Amino acid sequence: MAPPRAPYIVPALKKHTATVIMAHGLGDRMSLAQNWRRRGMFDEVAFIFPNAPMIPITVNFGMTMPGWHDLTKLGRELDYESAIRHQDEPGVLRSRDYFNTLIKEQIDKGIKPSRIVLGGFSQGAAISVFTGITCKEKLGGVFGLSSYLVLSDKLKNYIPENWPNKKTPFFLAHGLEDEIVLFDFGDLSAKKMKEIGLEDVTFKSYPNLGHSADPVEIEDLARFLQKVIPPEDDGQASAGL
């Protein structure tokens, strides 16, 4: 398998004090930064959009496409129990390790872990949530749009002993009409996250929303980011990443 292409980066406009790593879903790209920038938001935040490697996806008849892990089922076939039975554990762990590498790169650049937020959409959200739960660094926050919990039956095996992110804010959002990752799967995943001991999990639902994002959901996400990585710029210009 070829390594993923380098991430797409939107540098901070002011002094770089925080980073948001946003991962796409199966085969797509996710970019909200430009819209927020046009509104004068998150000027001191660098946005990193990682690219998934090209892998065969079983549910797409083995076709090679960008993916964070293999999937054997989608839609009404992808429920909590079937997800446990058909998990691509090596793929999940490979992507988690890559996300942790991106986090470490930001820390090495001087960004505090508490000013790093990890999240994404669909598959990217699932890996972001798993990475956030199991990360050895205390992150600022984690979000997942149309997300689901991977390796839930083995999750405790991967949680660090001191569990740095037990109290980290997690924001989960899901459309009630999602036809790819069903709402019930997302809802149950959020409940499972609370059951294992996460103390700050917010789960919001959106009527008439399928497997996509809408303006209300994006506004809720923006408010979450404003809360967990508030501005602390001193007015200096950014040197970029």
Swiss-Prot record:
Active site (UniProt): S122 (charge relay system), D178 (charge relay system), H211 (charge relay system)
Name the reaction it catalyses.
Answer: S-hexadecanoyl-L-cysteinyl-[protein] + H2O = L-cysteinyl-[protein] + hexadecanoate + H(+)
Keyword Kinase in annotation: no
| Subcellular location(s) of the protein | Cytoplasm; Nucleus
Q: Give the domain of life.
A: Eukaryota
What EC number(s) does the entry state? Answer: 3.1.2.-, 3.1.2.22
Top-tier EC class: hydrolase
List the keywords (alphabetical).
Answer: Cytoplasm, Fatty acid metabolism, Hydrolase, Lipid metabolism, Nucleus, Serine esterase
GO molecular function terms here? carboxylic ester hydrolase activity; palmitoyl-(protein) hydrolase activity
Cellular component (GO) terms are: cytoplasm; nucleus
Which biological process terms from the Gene Ontology are attached to this UniProt entry?
fatty acid metabolic process
Q: List the disulfide bonds.
A: none
The UniProt similarity line reads: Belongs to the AB hydrolase superfamily. AB hydrolase 2 family.
Function comment:
Hydrolyzes fatty acids from S-acylated cysteine residues in proteins with a strong preference for palmitoylated G-alpha proteins over other acyl substrates. Mediates the deacylation of G-alpha proteins such as GPA1 in vivo, but has weak or no activity toward palmitoylated Ras proteins. Has weak lysophospholipase activity in vitro; however such activity may not exist in vivo.
Q: What is this protein called?
A: Acyl-protein thioesterase 1
Which source organism? Aspergillus fumigatus (strain ATCC MYA-4609 / CBS 101355 / FGSC A1100 / Af293)
